[in-house]
Amino acid sequence: MMYAFLPHLKKVNHAAIVNVSSGLAFVPLLISAVYCATKAALHSYTQSLRVQLSNTPIKVFELMPPATETELLGDFEEQDMQGISVMNTDKMVEAFIKGFERDTLEIRPGQSNQLRFMSRFFPGFILRQMSRPVENMHRSAGKAR
C-alpha cells in the first residue's frame, strides 16, 4: 500500500512514513517467535526503505514500542510476563510524538532501548534472560507429570 502513495508523497515538501515494529525486533521472545521474526523483518525493511528514500522529502520513522497496555497482552499468561515492565499507552504515544518532533528516526521508548543495547553488546546474555521464563515453565510442567 505504501508504494501506491509514494508518488504523491514525493511531490510534497515534507512527508513521513511511520512503521510500527517492536523492541522484540532485537531479541526473540520464545513464546512469540513468529511475532518477533516479523518485527525483525519490518525493522530491516524500514532501514532499507530509509536509505532508498534518503534523496526524497520523505522521512522514514520506526516506532519500536516495548510491551504496551493493549489487547495484545491479553493473549499472554501472567507467568509469561514476569520480569517484563509494561508501558502505559499514553506514555508510549508521548514518546512517539517527542521522537517524531525531534526527527528521531528510530524511536525506542522504555525497555525497547534497553533491548537494543543489550542485543548489540551482550547478545547471548539477553537471549538467555529472555528465555528464562519459558524454560521455567517447561521445568514446572515436567515436574507436574
Residue ranges with predicted function:
Residues M2, T38:
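Active-site helix of classical SDR
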Residues A4-N13:
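A short helix-coil junction within the Rossmann-fold of NAD(P)-dependent oxidoreductases
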Residues L6, A41, T46-S54, K59:
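Catalytic Tyr-X3-Lys helix of short-chain dehydrogenase/reductase
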Residues S22:
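Residue(s) in the substrate-gating loop at a strand-loop-helix junction
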Residues A25-V27:
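Conserved catalytic-site region of short-chain dehydrogenase/reductase
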Residues L29-A33:
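Active-site loop immediately N-terminal to the catalytic Tyr-X3-Lys motif
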Residues V51-S112:
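SDR active-site lid
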Residues S85, D90-R145:
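C-terminal tail/cap regions
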